[in-house]
């Protein structure tokens, strides 16, 4: 009886550790590899507070800093650019009724107003100083016409 019980406990521990390893190491590594960020010192892909997965900073960023190319010279959204979640500008009210203001105001990044004159690429820019681990968000409402616009009723949950 003790052998069966110890086998069940060992199996439970093995399965639990396997789930933890898969969820917190293997899946994030695969997702970051897919988007070219596996060993990036700048960004990582992770579970979003807004929706699905998002892109997060790995180091502090300065307001106005170019973060990465979001749209290439052929007007195709880059894989990394596709991971920025939409948050409407102005005041955003969460389900709890909290209004975002000041440093917590989203969006915290934006698409450059024009393509780079030399490369034809569109960059994501920091709208304010960003801390380590912040999810990047942008307002898609005023992006160029070749980028799909968001549902006007969408509200960014904080």
Indicate where each model-derived feature is located:
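A detector of low-complexity, intrinsically disordered, Ser/Thr/Gly/Pro/Ala-rich segments
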Residues: 1, 5, 14, 99-102, ...
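C-terminal helix/juxtamembrane-tail motif
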Residues: 2-4, 144-158
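Terminal signal-anchor or tail-anchor transmembrane helices
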Residues: 2-30
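Catalytic core of the SET domain in histone-lysine N-methyltransferases
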Residues: 36-48, 72-146
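Residue-level "contact hotspot" at macromolecular interaction interfaces
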Residues: 50, 54-56, 60, 129-131
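Intrinsic-disorder/low-complexity, polar/charged segments enriched in Ser/Thr/Lys/Arg/Asp/Glu/Gln
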Residues: 56, 66, 121-123
């Amino acid at each position: 009886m003790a052998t069966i019980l110890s086998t069940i406990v060992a199996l439970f521990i093995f399965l639990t550790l396997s789930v933890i390893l898969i969820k917190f190491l293997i899946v994030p590594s695969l997702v970051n590899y897919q988007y070219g960020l596996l060993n990036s010192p700048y960004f990582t892909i992770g579970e979003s507070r807004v929706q699905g997965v998002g892109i997060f900073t790995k180091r502090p960023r300065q307001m106005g800093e170019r973060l990465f190319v979001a749209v290439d010279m052929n007007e195709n959204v880059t894989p990394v650019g596709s991971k920025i979640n939409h948050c409407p500008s102005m005041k955003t009210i969460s389900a709890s009724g909290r209004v975002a203001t000041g440093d917590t105001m989203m969006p915290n990044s934006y698409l450059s107003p024009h393509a780079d004159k030399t490369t034809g690429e569109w960059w994501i820019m920091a709208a304010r100083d960003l801390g380590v681990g912040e999810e990047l968000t942008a307002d898609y409402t005023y992006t160029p016409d070749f980028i799909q616009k968001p549902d006007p009723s969408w509200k960014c949950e904080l």
